[in-house]
Swiss-Prot record:
This is Phosphatidylserine decarboxylase proenzyme. Catalyzes the formation of phosphatidylethanolamine (PtdEtn) from phosphatidylserine (PtdSer). Its EC number is 4.1.1.65. One of its GO terms (cellular component) is plasma membrane. It comes from Geobacter sp. (strain M21). Pathway: Phospholipid metabolism; phosphatidylethanolamine biosynthesis; phosphatidylethanolamine from CDP-diacylglycerol: step 2/2. Pfam families: PS_Dcarbxylase. The active site is at S188 (schiff-base intermediate with substrate).
């Protein structure tokens, strides 16, 4: 897997460079040609600052207990319950986290384990707060297995605005809990399917911090 420890996620560099270049160009044109470029230059400057903010990639302090499942994403819990996960066709405890454009969008491994399977599904782009998004939207998933043999599934879901999923991990990789493994651009959702018997330690509407907030304790 790639190095993901930069303070700004590398996927944001092209956007930041483009907006910054446009800001500089418009400012120079306005300065030397005395043209009315102040407003568009200001607009692109604001876009540059927002893009830096959006692709921020802060360090996190992950709890030490290996049986603890941590949040894979910053955001708000919008679903809790038992479901059948469509890729494995198994029953799991499902937690869905909605990431707004104001949240950090870097995703982190919820547990330490090996990636035993990965899948990508083309799909639609429903609003990710709509439960249909879990099953019908474009998505990238990983099946993780712990050292104790427990399996769980973590799925990055694209949304109405977010249509670019980035996943660094692949089948055969080993992930440590809290490690960065991907991101989704510009607002999205992340679904995590935990083994039955996991003690869930959060409630609907709760805010989560990737790599730090405890979702539950494995059985």
């Amino acid at each position: 897997m790639r190095n993901t420890d930069t303070p700004i996620a590398v996927e944001g560099y092209p956007f930041i460079a483009g907006f910054a270049a446009a800001t500089l160009l418009l400012a120079l044109l306005g300065q030397f040609l005395h043209l009315g470029f102040f407003v568009p230059a200001t607009l692109f400057f604001v876009l540059t600052v927002f893009t830096v903010f959006f692709f921020r990639n802060p360090e996190r302090v992950t709890p030490g207990d290996e049986n603890t499942v941590v949040a894979p994403a910053d955001g708000e819990v919008i679903f809790l319950g038992k479901v059948i996960e469509p890729h494995t066709n198994g029953e799991f405890e499902k937690i869905s986290i909605f990431m707004s454009v104001f949240n950090v969008h870097v995703n982190r491994a919820p547990i330490s384990g090996k990636v035993v399977d990965g899948f990508y599904t083309k799909g639609k782009f429903f609003d990710v707060r709509d439960e249909r998004a879990s099953f019908e939207n474009e998505q990238q998933g990983l099946v993780l297995e712990t050292a104790a043999g427990l399996r769980m599934v973590v799925v990055q879901v694209a949304g109405l605005i977010a249509r670019r999923i980035v996943c660094y991990a692949k089948t055969g990789d080993s992930l440590s809990r809290g490690r960065r493994y991907g991101l989704i651009r510009f607002g999205s959702r992340l679904d995590i399917y935990l083994p039955l018997g996991t003690r869930i330690d959060l409630v609907m509407g709760q805010k989560t911090v990737a790599g730090e907030t405890v979702l539950g304790i494995l059985p």
